[in-house]
Every structure is written in structure tokens, then in C-alpha cells.
Design a protein with these regions (language model features):
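Gly/Pro-rich loop segments of beta-rich domains
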Residues: 54, 116-144, 172-189, 217-243, ...
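Short loop/turn segments immediately following the C-termini of beta-strands
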Residues: 159, 204, 258, 312, ...
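Residue-level detector of Asp-centered blade-edge/turn motifs that repeat once per structural unit
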Residues: 148-151, 193-196, 247-250, 301-304, ...
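Blade-level signature of beta-propeller repeat domains, shared across WD40, Kelch, NHL, RCC1
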Residues: 403-429
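A short loop-to-beta-strand structural motif that recurs across blades of beta-propeller domains
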Residues: 162-166, 172, 207-211, 217, ...
Length: 429
């Protein structure tokens, strides 16, 4: 009986030792790492629709189980294996990291992907005229200011035709304003929309700012019709060849009062004041009337209410805070074509600018025949054109523009250009 008990005890001890050994092995066992890792991608740049190969480890062989983004923009994964993904560059990706998400774990590329913008012609064929139509069948005469409404339609201040035109996403052109004898226009140079769908027109040679309701009612928001300089309400105010126009989220209208070298502000009630500028041509920063501009052409406003000015003859971009303080946002004042930081970059007669939802600023750098971009980090680059003047669609700098005076950006990041010298509307995506 004692001998049996001793054997049982030995078996129990061996069993317990086995359990302890097994648990020790479990504690020291390191499971394989199946988290995704990007080791490389190629090519390093590309336009929308290009195929990029991402190599690494930990990818899911089921393409749908890998979520890939370029600079935060979702891409389509066409094929997948555990070590390689083939993905399609999404429209408007921009420069930035490539990210892969699998099973809740995200990995980012070490290097940034360089997005190449594609330029196409939305409407017009380079021939001067005033025909409505679709695509190359439409005609413009000195298209300058551009705006995009909430529906995504593009509006063009067709300066030489004394009209404002509408261009749909399909490229169909119709006349929006100016062909009615009750509201004739005289060389309109700017157009903008507010959140309620009201249109505002800088009726340049009539020295007035017009308002058109969604129902088609036209009224004079401000301006007497006589060139001059006066603050006041409605027609008591005066402008001198107003060009650019923009609207903030509160419905305030900002005007590049070009020949007065001032930036004006109009409330929804039609009260006109001077936001910045003393009327003298110069390059002076400071508060309100201390600041000076030289032939400011374009204005844009961001979501925070900051106003950006294409200070044309100064070859710089200015920024005005809501309180009226003016600073030089980009450019060193020398006419040239230099990318880089905002303090070292150079522009040549910039005439128009626009902001997007990510706070990038796009510039029609007119005499450089280039479209430039300024990121929130303060980096200036050419996204299209810039080699020489011409009328060529293509990718990046292989595309050509001619004396572009207008620019606008829609909610999806598509950029539209009033290609003035080519009598056409171009699209960049």
C-alpha cells in the first residue's frame, strides 16, 4: 500500500513538472509578427490612375482586406499578396505618406509619394468667341475670374464678352449673366458664391459689385458706377476697377479694388469699408491703412477668415488677418520662378489665387505661365506648367498655359484655371 502511494506521488510530481515546463514554454514563446510593414514602393511618383507597387510584409492576400491611402486619400488595391500590393493612385492624392492598414494596424512609408497633377481642357479650344456649347465647341474671350458653386459648376467672368458663363462638370457652357438688357455687364473680372448660393460679380468697368440670387434677381450690392474711392453703404461707395472677389463663411464680400490699391470689405447689408491699404502703390506690411499694395488682382479667403491677396506688381502673395493686419505670405518681391519656402520663392505677376479645404493656396502665376501651390507647411511648388507659354494638356510641367488670370478649387480638390491667353478653361486633378 505504501509502495503504491509512493508511485502515485512520483506520477503526480512528474505531471506537475510537465505542466510547469509547458507554461514556461508558453511564456517564452514569441508569436510571429503579422503586422503590416512597408519596406519600399515604386515608382516614387505618378499621376492619378497610375499603378504603384508596394512591397513589404504582413499584407493580406485578400486585396479587399488591405486599406491603402495616399496622403490620407483612399486608393484602390488591385492585387495583393503577403509581401506585395499593387494600388491605383487616387485623384487628387497630393504629396505625402503611403499608408497600409490591416486588421486595425497601420504602417506608413518612410518616404513621401510625389503626386503628379494631370491637366486637361474642360471647355474652349483656344479660339476667341462667345459661343455656348460643350467642350471644344464653346468659346470665350479673355476668361479671367473663376468660381465654383456648391453643385460643382464652374462660373467664368468672361471679360471680353461682357458675360458670366456657367460650365458644368461635363464641359457644357451656357450664359449665366450679362445677356439681359436689364443687367448688362461691362468687362466683369471676378465672380464668387456664398453658402446660400448667391453669386457676386465684380463688374469691373462699371465699378460696381453685383449680387444675383439663386432665383435670378440681380441687384447692385455696392458701388456708384463712377470710379473713385469712398466707403459707405450700397451705391454711396466707390471703387476703381475692382477685379478679384471672394466671400467668407459669414457672407462678407472681399474685393481687390485694383486701381485703388486697396482691399475692400462689404457686409451682407452692403456696408463698404477698407480692410487694408492706404491707396499708394507699395509693398508695406502693417495694420489696415498702414499697409500698401501694388495693383492687387486676386483675393481668396480661408475657413478661418484670413484673406489672401495676389499682389500682382509686387510679385508676392499677401495675407490679411480678420483684424486687418497685413503680412507677406509668400515671395521675396523679385520677379522670377523659384520654388522652395515661402520666404525664398519667387513669382512673376501673380493674378489670382484660391484656397482648398486643406488650407493649401493655389496661385495663377500669370507671367510664369505656371500654377503654383503653397502648402500649410509653407512650401511652394509648381503643380503644372511653367516651362513656357502654349496650349498643351499633359502631366505636371509638360502642360502649357498662356497668361492665366483665374483659378478656383472645388470641394474635391480639383483645380480650375481661367487660361486667359488660350481662351479656355483648364482642369487640374
Amino acid at each position: 500500500m505504501k509502495k503504491i502511494s509512493a508511485n502515485v506521488l512520483i506520477l503526480i510530481l512528474l505531471f506537475l513538472a510537465g505542466i510547469i515546463l509547458l507554461q514556461a514554454c508558453k511564456r517564452h514563446h514569441i508569436p510571429p509578427n503579422n503586422n503590416p510593414v512597408i519596406t519600399a514602393f515604386a515608382p516614387a511618383n505618378g499621376p492619378m490612375g497610375a499603378t504603384i507597387t508596394i512591397t513589404g510584409t504582413g499584407f493580406n492576400p485578400d486585396a479587399l482586406q488591405n486599406q491603402v491611402t495616399f496622403n490620407g486619400v483612399t486608393a484602390v488595391v488591385s492585387t495583393a499578396s503577403a509581401t506585395q500590393l499593387k494600388v491605383i493612385v487616387p485623384v487628387g492624392a497630393g504629396d505625402g505618406k503611403i499608408s497600409v492598414k490591416r486588421g486595425g494596424v497601420v504602417t506608413n512609408s518612410v518616404n513621401d509619394f510625389k503626386y503628379l497633377y494631370t491637366v486637361s481642357t474642360l471647355a474652349g479650344d483656344g479660339t476667341v468667341g462667345h459661343n455656348n456649347g460643350t467642350g471644344a465647341g464653346a468659346r470665350f474671350d479673355i476668361p479671367i475670374g473663376l468660381a465654383v458653386n456648391m453643385a460643382g459648376n464652374i462660373y467664368v467672368a468672361d471679360y471680353g464678352n461682357n458675360l458670366v458663363r456657367q460650365v458644368t462638370l461635363a464641359g457644357t457652357v451656357t450664359t449665366f449673366a450679362g445677356d439681359d438688357n436689364n443687367a448688362p455687364l461691362n468687362a466683369p473680372a471676378g465672380v464668387a458664391f456664398d453658402g446660400a448660393g448667391n453669386a457676386y460679380i465684380a463688374d469691373t468697368y462699371n465699378n460696381q459689385i453685383l449680387k444675383i440670387t439663386p432665383g435670378g434677381m440681380v441687384s447692385t450690392l455696392a458701388g456708384s458706377g463712377t470710379p473713385g474711392f469712398a466707403n459707405g453703404t450700397g451705391t454711396a461707395a466707390q471703387f476703381a476697377l475692382p477685379f478679384g472677389i471672394a466671400v467668407d463663411n459669414s457672407g462678407n464680400v472681399y474685393v481687390a479694388d485694383t486701381h485703388n490699391n486697396r482691399i475692400r470689405k462689404i457686409t451682407p447689408q452692403g456696408v463698404v469699408s477698407t480692410l487694408a491699404g492706404d491707396g499708394n502703390a507699395g509693398l508695406v506690411n502693417g495694420d489696415g491703412a498702414v499697409a500698401e499694395f501694388d495693383f492687387p488682382n486676386g483675393v481668396a479667403v480661408d475657413a478661418a477668415g484670413n484673406v489672401y491677396v495676389a499682389d500682382t506688381r509686387n510679385n508676392v502673395i499677401r495675407k490679411i488677418l480678420p483684424a486687418g493686419t497685413v503680412s507677406t505670405f509668400a515671395g521675396d518681391g523679385t520677379a522670377g520662378l523659384v520654388d522652395g519656402t515661402v520666404t525664398t520663392a519667387q513669382f512673376n505677376y501673380p493674378c489670382a489665387l484660391a484656397t482648398d479645404v486643406l488650407n493649401n493656396v493655389y496661385i495663377a502665376d500669370t507671367h510664369n505661365n505656371a500654377i503654383r501651390k503653397i502648402t500649410p507647411a509653407g512650401i511652394v511648388s509648381i503643380i503644372a506648367g511653367g516651362s513656357s507659354y502654349g496650349f498643351i494638356d499633359g502631366i505636371g510641367t509638360s502642360a502649357h498655359f498662356f497668361d492665366s488670370h483665374g483659378i478656383a478649387v472645388d470641394m474635391h480638390g480639383n483645380v480650375y484655371v481661367g487660361d486667359t491667353g488660350n481662351s479656355s478653361i483648364r482642369k487640374i486633378q
